[in-house]
A protein has these predicted regions:
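Hydrophobic/aromatic-rich core segments of domains that either
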Residues: 211-307
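Short intrinsically disordered coil segments
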Residues: 71-75, 121-133, 277-282
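A short, structured loop/turn motif at beta-sheet edges
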Residues: 47-49, 98-103, 161-163, 218-220, ...
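Active-site nucleophilic cysteine motif
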Residues: 166-170, 202-217
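Acidic low-complexity segments
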Residues: 97-200
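Intrinsically disordered, low-complexity N-terminal segments that are enriched in acidic
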Residues: 18-116
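Secretory targeting signatures
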Residues: 1-30, 56, 263, 330
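TerminUS-proximal long segments
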Residues: 300-330
Length: 330
């Protein structure tokens, strides 16, 4: 009964999310559907020399037009569900831990994801209204739309009369300039775009690629935001992350960790469409595979996206993350 209550409460909270976040289904072709059972666990350690009372924020898979999410269980049981200003839903657990005590948090989710592609013949896109522009084209810490170099490149390579053509041109340019390497920090668009002997390149991982694309799209008047979650290589996977070895692993962590970030843009009549250029190193404008699991959106807040956003303690230390994905096609 308790698990059913958790599911019901989460659904009621998520249903309150603004319709704008789900987007439109006009001109969109939905194809395969995959149902995942996701089991996760997070190891927290109290490294302080006193007992701590900690509120731990647990990222939950979100509901979108192409993803339905259900919480089947969380232990310890959450004291509440909370929505942030970007519309993301978190479970909040209250933990009391003695000095050096280790505590596991266990979660189980059911997530149904649909692959989709937009029908580009349906529309060239319509430029957004003022409210969307105001919210989704502003400058932020990592998306500096006042950087004249970034803005000039965006206009040179992607300025067109139609938003969809602009996004497609921009995606082609960005994916052709990627110098991929794991970045445990976050450079932001100002520092991710560098000039080399081969011209401008984007140095970093999925976060830097997304940051540069979002900044350029916003500078061109296209509403854009970041999405964080997972990109799987198959429907059944075991993924884990040991925070104590991340620094030394480098690109080796990609063999067992698929935490991911990618951009979304808003183009009427399609609504929010994904642009994951690192899925097969292709522009992928409005082409989305069911190997993605969405855990949240970045519009104004920043959680670390690809690494630590799964579980966010206030005073304790996150030491280990483990996920098992069991997906069934059909």
């Amino acid at each position: 009964m308790r698990n059913k209550a958790v599911v019901l409460l989460l659904l009621l909270v998520i249903l309150a999310i603004n319709v704008e976040q789900s987007g439109s289904l006009g001109g969109v072709n939905v194809s395969s559907r995959v149902t995942y059972t996701i089991k996760g666990r997070f190891l927290l350690v109290n490294t302080n020399n006193i007992t701590v009372n900690d509120y731990v924020y647990i990222s939950l898979p979100q509901n979108t037009s192409f993803q339905q999410s259900f919480v089947l269980g969380i232990e310890p049981s959450p004291v509440r569900f909370q929505r942030d200003e970007d519309g993301n839903i978190f479970a909040v657990a209250y933990i009391v831990a003695k000095p050096q005590e280790k505590i596991w948090i266990n979660v189980t989710y059911k997530v149904v994801v649909s692959s989709y592609s937009i029908d580009t013949s349906a529309s060239k896109g319509v430029w957004p209204n003022f409210l969307l522009l105001k919210k989704y084209t502003s400058s932020t810490r990592y998306w500096d739309i006042y950087n004249t170099t970034v803005v000039k490149i965006a206009y040179d390579v992607a300025y067109t009369s139609y938003p969809l053509a602009t996004v497609e041109s921009l995606a082609r340019w960005v994916v052709s300039r990627v110098n991929y390497n794991v970045n445990l920090g976050r450079s932001g668009s100002d520092h991710a775009l560098i000039y080399t002997s081969r011209g401008y390149r984007i140095q970093g991982d999925c976060v830097e690629v997304a940051d540069v694309f979002i900044t350029m799209a916003r500078s061109l008047g296209v509403p854009a935001r970041g999405v964080y979650g997972f990109l799987l290589t198959s429907y059944k996977e075991h993924q884990w992350l040991n925070m104590s070895t991340v620094q030394s692993e480098g690109e080796g962590l990609l063999t067992h960790w698929g935490g991911h970030m990618w951009p979304e843009v808003y183009v009427d009549p399609y609504g929010w469409i994904d642009v994951d250029m690192l899925d097969g190193m292709s522009p992928n404008v409005g082409v989305f595979s069911a190997r993605h699991i969405v855990f949240g959106f970045e519009e104004t807040k920043y959680y670390g996206a690809a690494l630590t956003s799964s579980c966010i303690p206030s005073y304790m230390t996150l030491e280990y993350i483990d996920y098992i994905f069991e997906g069934e096609l059909g």
